UniProtKB/Swiss-Prot annotation:
The gene is PIGR. Residues 662-764 are cytoplasmic. Disulfide bonds join 40-110, 56-64, 152-220, 257-325, 271-279, 371-441, 385-395, 482-544, 486-520, 496-503. SUPFAM superfamilies: Immunoglobulin (SSF48726). PANTHER family: POLYMERIC IMMUNOGLOBULIN RECEPTOR, POLYMERIC-IMMUNOGLOBULIN RECEPTOR. This is Polymeric immunoglobulin receptor. Residues 609-637, 717-738 are annotated as: Disordered. Residues 19-120, 145-237, 250-352, 364-458, 462-561 form the Ig-like V-type domain. Changing residue 119 to T: Disrupts the interaction with pentameric IgM. It comes from Homo sapiens. Residues 1-18 form the signal peptide.
Amino acid sequence: MLLFVLTCLLAVFPAISTKSPIFGPEEVNSVEGNSVSITCYYPPTSVNRHTRKYWCRQGARGGCITLISSEGYVSSKYAGRANLTNFPENGTFVVNIAQLSQDDSGRYKCGLGINSRGLSFDVSLEVSQGPGLLNDTKVYTVDLGRTVTINCPFKTENAQKRKSLYKQIGLYPVLVIDSSGYVNPNYTGRIRLDIQGTGQLLFSVVINQLRLSDAGQYLCQAGDDSNSNKKNADLQVLKPEPELVYEDLRGSVTFHCALGPEVANVAKFLCRQSSGENCDVVVNTLGKRAPAFEGRILLNPQDKDGSFSVVITGLRKEDAGRYLCGAHSDGQLQEGSPIQAWQLFVNEESTIPRSPTVVKGVAGGSVAVLCPYNRKESKSIKYWCLWEGAQNGRCPLLVDSEGWVKAQYEGRLSLLEEPGNGTFTVILNQLTSRDAGFYWCLTNGDTLWRTTVEIKIIEGEPNLKVPGNVTAVLGETLKVPCHFPCKFSSYEKYWCKWNNTGCQALPSQDEGPSKAFVNCDENSRLVSLTLNLVTRADEGWYWCGVKQGHFYGETAAVYVAVEERKAAGSRDVSLAKADAAPDEKVLDSGFREIENKAIQDPRLFAEEKAVADTRDQADGSRASVDSGSSEEQGGSSRALVSTLVPLGLVLAVGAVAVGVARARHRKNVDRVSIRSYRTDISMSDFENSREFGANDNMGASSITQETSLGGKEEFVATTESTTETKEPKKAKRSSKEEAEMAYKDFLLQSSTVAAEAQDGPQEA
C-alpha cells in the first residue's frame, strides 16, 4: 500500500523532482536550405561549465539519440553541417545547423551530462518547404508588424497606363491597390503606391504594419491589355523569433525594444502573453501598469528612432514567460502592430542572495536595508533610489557611495559599505509616513544585480530612546544618553557621528541597566556619548544604534547644536524623562540626569522646596519666641514647683493608703481575674511600643512600601504576619505582695519627683 502511494505521488509531482534549470527556445522555425542557431542556457556553476553538453533527437519510444556533443561526437546525419560551441563564461552553448531539410523537423533536447537525466530542455524544430518558385518570382520575407516594399518594373510603352497590385486568393486575383486611387478595405491606412520619376521604369507598393494574413502570392501589373507588364511576388510574414533571456531569481532584466523611426511618435507597450493569443499589458507609455509589477518596473524614455527599454527588478518565478514589445495608439497589442519578442526564463538556482523584499518601520524610528551586489565589482559605485510611479516611472537617486546625499535626507540617510562582503547597507531613520514606498539598490556595474525593497510604516514606538535636538556649550562637557531595551541585550551598541560618506564610530560609555523600560530593566542598557571640551566642530547629527556582526539594526538620531557660554552658568544636557515608561514621549533635554536614576518631575522638587522653606520659617519663629520669653518663664516656674511638690506628696500618701486598704479587702478574690488584668496591661503596652519604633516580628511589616519603576509609581504592599506573640507565663503573686510592690514603686517615684523639684530651679 505504501509503495502504491509513493508511486502515485511521483506520478502527480514529476515536475517538482525533475525541474531542470536548462533553458532554450521552445520552437524554432525555418525553411529548406536555410540554417538555424539554437542557444541553450545553464547555471554557470563550476560543475556545469565543465560537464558534457549535447544535442539529441527524441524518438517515438522516449529515447534521445545524440547528434552532436561538446566532447567531439558528431552524428553522420550532421557531418559537415553542424557544430556545438560552449561559452562557459556566459553559461550558454550554441548548436548551429545548416542546409536544413524537412527531414530535420522534429522534437529535440539540449542538455548537460547524460541524455537520460533531467538536466535538459525540449526544443521543437519545424522546417517548412520553400515557396514554389515561378519564373521571375521575387520572395519577400518580413517580420510581423514591419514594412515591406514590393518593386514592380515595367516597359516604356506602359509608362502612362494604369498600375496595380493584386493578391492571389484561391483561384482568383483580388485587387489590393491601383494608381487610380482604389485601396482594398483590408489595407486601408497602411498601403500606398508610389510611381517613380519619368526617367525610371518602376513603381512600388509599400505595405506597413504587416499582418499574418498579408502573407501570400502577389502580382504587379502595368497596363490592362495583352501588352501589360507583370511581376510575381511571394510575401512571407514571419512571427518574430523570441530572443531568449536567462536571468536569476531576485535579479533584474532589461528588454531593449527597437521598432523603427516610423513609430517614433506612437504609444509603446510591453505585454506578456498568457493563454492563446492574449497579451496582457505590463506597462505602456500611456500610464498603464500591471499591479504585479508595481514598484519594480521602469519604462525608459523613448528615443527619436522609436526605441525604448523596460527594466524589471526583483524577478520572481511567475515572471517567466513570453514578452512582446510594440507600438500602437491604444498602448496595447493590435493586429499589425510592430513587435519584438522575448522568452524569459527565471533561474531558481540564483547566485543573488536572499534579502528582505519588505522592511517595516515605525514613525520616528528607522530601517536598515541590505543590498547585495556582485562580489567581483566591489569597487563599483553603489546607489539607492526612490521609485516613483508617475507616467512611465522614474527612480531619482537619494544617496551614493561617493558621498552624495540628497539635501532633504541629510542627517538621516547613510550608505555603508562592507568591503568583500558582497552587500552594502542603507540606513534611513527619523521615519515619517512619506517614507513609505519602493526603493532600488543599484551599482554602476552589473545591471543584473538590481534589487527592490518596499518600506512600510506601521504603528508603534521606536525601540531606542534618545533626547531630541540638544544644545552644547563651547568648552564644556556634553553627555547624551541612549536607552536600549532588553531585546537588544545581545547586540553591539554604538554611537557615531553622521557625515555624507557614512557614520564615524565614536567611543561611548555603558552606564548599566536603563530604567526607561519596566519589563526587563536588568537586560536593558543605557549607553552615553560624552563630548569633552565641546568645539564648533562637534555640531551635527549623532546616531546611536545596534548591530550584529555586519548586519545593522535600529538607529536613533540626535542633532547637537553648539552655542557660546552663558554668564548664568553652564547647563548639563541629558535626556528629559529618560526613564519614562515606553508609552510616554521623550522630551527635549534640559533637566539634569542624576546617577542614572529616574528623573523626577521638576514640579515635585519645587513643591518639596516650598514645604521645606515653610518648615524652616516656622522653626525659626518658634526659636525666637522661646528665647525671648525664657527669662520670664524661669521665675514663675520656681514658685509653681515649690507649691505643687508638697501637695503632690500629700496626695500620693493618701493614694497609697487607699490602695493598701483595697488590696487587703480583695485578699480572697480569684487570682485568675488579677492575672487576666495584668495580661491586658501587658498586651496594651506591647501595642503602644510600636509607636516608639519597637517591632518584635522583624520578618513582617505593616508599612506599605513605595517603589518607582520606569517613571511610573508602582505600589507594593507587604503582608503582615498573622502569628500572635504569646505572653510568657509569670509566677503567681498574692494581693499582699502586689500591694507591697506598689508601695515600693510609689516611694521611688516620690523621691525622684522631689529631687527634680530641688534641682530644677538651680539649673534654670
